């Protein structure tokens, strides 16, 4: 998938439409819908989209210049770590996100990576998603360090 997706990004940048581009687009649409249905009610699966919601509410000027997927992209490394994926897998995803030009750090969203901003975002996510288990809160807090640059 990663190799085909990287090729598709390059082809689109060149203005070329190929079956690989079609396949990646349709795969992403299908996976997004499936993930949305499967994750309904799962708090661990809500971190990346929780970041989007927090940015939309707390950092409106930054939100205005970003696409939904760009903000969610920044939360993916956190999401993967919270869900227990290996460091190798997380790094592979981060490299791919960087390859396609989506943010993987707060600073790329235009948000200062300060403790105050992190605490505002975490409070919003915990409240909005209903994450009240201290162990899960701490796991999420710890893994946000991945995107605090």
State each model region's role:
Residues 85-149:
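C-terminal charged capping/lid subdomain of soluble metabolic enzymes
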